[in-house]
């Protein structure tokens, strides 16, 4: 079993008529993702790559029975798109958009929680259950079906580690890019809990980075897990006070250093790799 999304997931693409929306819709369709609808206000009644376009998510749910959404909408309008999906009854919302204002992120975070939906992102590469479905912008050719779950704050590091696992013959059950902003819809612990309960997943890779306390909080949960966890923390040489790529990747007041996160993960029983290749090798040792 995959977590969050699988071959039964019916997807609506919000922003399907834009360049990014159309480009990634084609890639997702080629992978086998069941894209049943697109949404762009004012473009209802048209088609993109054979996918019917509606004016609203509510209409897409009613007409095409969509139950998941992937959002390619510019930052000023992305929060409204997320909240529209939640209000329409969509249960899995993947927001790729970067640069959403913090107050907008807070509003959409709580609206999604109130609706009982799952939000992946924002500012994330999406989610893939290899061989089943893909919602997002990941390079699908590097993944293969298997029993290693990956949860990550970093897109490119996810790709590196997944590629290395695949090279070693280790496939993935589901790969979740939770996003690099300070406010995200789904955190490490929520995904770790799903992997812990998933019969198909035999080991988990956690990819963290400097900033915040998410990895330390995850370490507390890892203590209680029955499945082995291998970690990687980016930013070992990052200078304090300087944002390193993601809005959440900043060390402030001595909190959020790579050293503190590595120490917490190791104390919880996780093994921590120094390089993406070493992470894959540690997983191979365990399995």
Curated annotation (Swiss-Prot):
Record-level Gene Ontology MF annotations: nucleotide binding; succinate-CoA ligase (ADP-forming) activity; succinate-CoA ligase (GDP-forming) activity
Leader sequence residues: none
Active site (UniProt): 246
Pathway as given in its UniProt record: Carbohydrate metabolism; tricarboxylic acid cycle; succinate from succinyl-CoA (ligase route): step 1/1
PROSITE patterns xref list: SUCCINYL_COA_LIG_1, SUCCINYL_COA_LIG_2
Keywords: Ligase, Nucleotide-binding, Tricarboxylic acid cycle
Superkingdom field: Archaea
Tagged with keyword Hydrolase: no
Documented EC number(s): 6.2.1.5
Pfam families documented for this protein: CoA_binding, Ligase_CoA
GO biological process, alphabetically ordered: tricarboxylic acid cycle
Function text: Succinyl-CoA synthetase functions in the citric acid cycle (TCA), coupling the hydrolysis of succinyl-CoA to the synthesis of either ATP or GTP and thus represents the only step of substrate-level phosphorylation in the TCA. The alpha subunit of the enzyme binds the substrates coenzyme A and phosphate, while succinate binding and nucleotide specificity is provided by the beta subunit.
PANTHER family: SUCCINATE--COA LIGASE [ADP_GDP-FORMING] SUBUNIT ALPHA, MITOCHONDRIAL, SUCCINYL-COA LIGASE SUBUNIT ALPHA
Protein name: Succinate--CoA ligase [ADP-forming] subunit alpha 2
Lineage: Archaea, Methanobacteriati, Methanobacteriota, Archaeoglobi, Archaeoglobales
Gene designation: sucD2
């Amino acid at each position: 079993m995959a977590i969050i999304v699988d071959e039964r997931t019916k997807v609506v693409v919000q922003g399907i008529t834009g360049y990014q929306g159309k480009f990634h819709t084609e890639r997702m369709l080629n992978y086998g993702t069941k894209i049943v609808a697109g949404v762009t206000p004012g473009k209802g009644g048209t088609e993109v790559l054979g996918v019917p376009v509606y004016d609203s998510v509510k209409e897409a749910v009613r007409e095409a029975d969509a139950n998941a959404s992937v959002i390619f909408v510019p930052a000023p309008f992305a929060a409204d798109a997320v909240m529209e999906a939640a209000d329409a009854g969509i249960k899995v919302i993947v927001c790729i958009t970067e640069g959403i204002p913090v107050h907008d992120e807070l509003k959409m975070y709580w609206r999604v929680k109130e609706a009982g939906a799952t939000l992946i992102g924002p500012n994330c590469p999406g989610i893939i259950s290899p061989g089943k479905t893909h919602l997002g912008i990941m390079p699908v050719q590097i993944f293969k079906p298997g029993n290693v779950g990956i949860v990550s704050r970093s897109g490119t590091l996810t790709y590196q580690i997944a590629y290395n696992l695949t090279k070693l013959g280790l496939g993935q059950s589901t790969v979740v890019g939770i996003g690099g902003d300070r406010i995200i819809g789904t955190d490490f612990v929520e995904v770790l809990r799903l992997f812990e309960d998933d019969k198909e997943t035999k080991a988990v890779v956690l990819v963290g980075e400097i900033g915040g306390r998410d990895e330390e909080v995850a370490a507390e949960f890892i203590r209680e897990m029955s499945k082995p966890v291998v970690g990687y923390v980016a930013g070992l040489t990052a200078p304090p006070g300087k944002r390193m790529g993601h809005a959440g990747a900043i060390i402030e007041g001595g909190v959020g250093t790579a050293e503190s996160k590595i120490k917490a993960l190791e104390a919880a029983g996780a093994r921590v790799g120094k390089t993406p290749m070493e992470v894959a090798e540690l997983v191979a040792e365990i399995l």
